[in-house]
Amino acid sequence: MSREPGCNRWLLLAACAHLFFLLPPLRTRAFAVSVVPEGAEDETELPVLQKSQKSGTISKISRELKEIVFIIQSQSNSFHSKRAEDLKRDILKQAADLGKELPTVLLIHQMDGHEGAWTILPLMRDFSVTYGRNSSWIFFCEEDTRIQVVKLLETLGRFDGSKEWFLGKALYDEESTIIHHYAFAENPTAFTFPDFAAGWALSIPLVNKLAKKLKSEPLKSDFTIDLKHEIALYIWQKGEGPHLTPVPEFCTDDVNSYKADHCATTFSNFLPLCGEPVKKEDVFVAVKTCRKFHGDRIPVVKQTWEREAALIEYYSDYADISIPTIDLGIPNTDRGHCGKTFAILERFLNHSSPRTPWLVIVDDDTLISIFRLRRLLSCYDPNEPVFLGERYGYGLGTGGYSYITGGGGMVFSRIAVQKLLASKCRCYSMDAPDDMVLGMCFSGLGIPITHSPLFHQARPMDYPKGYLSHQIPVSFHKHWNIDPVKVYFTWLAPNTEESLNGKKAGYNREDL
């Protein structure tokens, strides 16, 4: 569903919000600090000179390392928090090999009690107060970013830390896109923003500047859709702040790739796999549709991904035995569909097998790989309340909530559905935005939203090629101006080249 900040229904939703709450082991690449000093006359002198020089080099690196604060953009779900803890240990282990001065390594989901910590900007004032006097850089990374500490220090050492720097691997739009509100429509390539998977850095002077601005001009209550783009826009300040400076050493190549030799950072996971994929019979798929789309959208589902699903039902406002569809007794609405979604949740809990641990709700114009979803779900515990998909936010600068955007698919563990329906949180109207109401409900229940960048609310061409290049995507959304069957078989169909360990395959994807 499209999002237009400022629409009356969003204001109504925010105004009504208070009513509802009544109701792999890591692979650490070896490194060495090697110095070949001048003046070594023979091999007997060399070890002594090396030891002295190396000691001084390590001491300098140790001091510089202490001036970097590492922020892992982690999540509280057990699968993600463990991966973040593993990365933290890896960073500290590398640092320990260089001397006694260890850097600060923080997990973002542990840093702040409020919902919006993952959006970064609300934390800038805390960063400034705590680290503004004794640090030089804040370095952000994802849980699957792999860091070569010595190379990172060498890379950051090229930049004057007393100036304002915004560093990262540059992404850009090749055409204006809805997820960026069609910004820079005349020349979308002119504006760049960081690929979080490669890591990105802010110098402390820039952090202090942002903190000062946020103190005088608090963040507006608005939507968070694509955080990396929105952070870059905020820093740029319509030309008053710095652009992103591209850093070639910030990479998203696989750690074992020949391309990674020059990299300070690499990326380790294109599609997680934690044991055997979940069984087809363990995933129940619910497709939301209506009579007017039975003739054009449902045939696309049947030509593409329906065959991957063992358990699938189509929910409509009209019972059509040729599909077949199930009439839930909920009239169709032009937008929102909250009533229909809650009816689906009730049906899953009361009419499906109690042994089916996972529910997926998709739109009739969602393109999804159930094959890849089953692999992904192998990493999540169905005995935990899991609500998984592409995460958006509403009003997070002022105490709002996160939600899973519906077009890319919403994944629920059975226990999450049980906890939701046991609460009193329900739709305030039948046409309320279902994904936002669900986000608000789960927030009130203390059940975190779990984000996966492999789900997509929009079409492939709405995302930078560089961003998609290190993904094996699970879903896309919308049939607008595309051949959806072609998109499915290009981007989502099970591919014989997909390796068993989830590494990136050599796809032959034409521009769509």
Segments the model singles out, each with a brief description of its role:
Residues S2-L512:
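Secretory-pathway lumenal glyco-enzymes, predominantly type II signal-anchor Golgi glycosyltransferases
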